[in-house]
């Protein structure tokens, strides 16, 4: 438990186990990636704008993003440029983009959510102000692990969001949904527990999937709700259950 909590707060870069100045290390790493893997490789003219956008995204992850809104925020003439900047950041392994699940292709293409490729990038940069939101950090860790587990040839990870509620992740194999996952650091509040379970039930009905999982920091139980079996598992067990 203590080791996981350290990972949750520090991130997964091995160097951070011995690095005394974590902020300096992360700043240097991000700076090198932006300069060498993005700016030089793609001949970016407006480096400062690119850096500001990437830092902005890392400050608000995990969150839905809009290329039009980013273009307006950073005074970029075209949303295509904003889209390219985000694509460059993803290819350089600073962020990862998760698309919205929908039976309609245009919805999947049009909606997206950004995650950090490592939680160390969320709050250890000089321009960071995201703080220690453990719920966001836990959600990001689960997403990173889902990417590791899924086969890119026939499996995908999406998020689900509807007016009635939302589910953090929908895991698909081909066109079939094989699991709906919610992530919540603490479900001791009755309101939080109800919201997370409701998201799973909405996901189950929309996707016709019966495998429903709620990942938390330490809770563990299984029960039936509205005819569906819901499994609540502690994240440290889920992470080692390959």
Residue spans of the language-model regions?
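Cofactor-binding loop segments of dinucleotide-utilizing enzymes, especially the Rossmann-like FAD-
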Residues: 119, 216-217
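Amphipathic alpha-helical segments of the small helical/lid subdomains adjacent to P-loop NTPase cores
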Residues: 1-12
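Short, charged, amphipathic alpha-helix that recurs within catalytic cores of restriction-modification
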Residues: 193-208
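Active-site ExK catalytic segment of metal-dependent nucleases
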Residues: 177-189
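Short active-site-adjacent structural elements
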Residues: 167, 189-192, 221-225
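Short, hydrophobic beta-strand segments that form beta-sheet elements in well-ordered domains
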Residues: 210-216
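Domain-level recognition of nuclease-like catalytic cores that cleave nucleotide substrates
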Residues: 217-242
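Accessory nucleic acid-recognition modules appended to NTPase machines
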Residues: 17-177
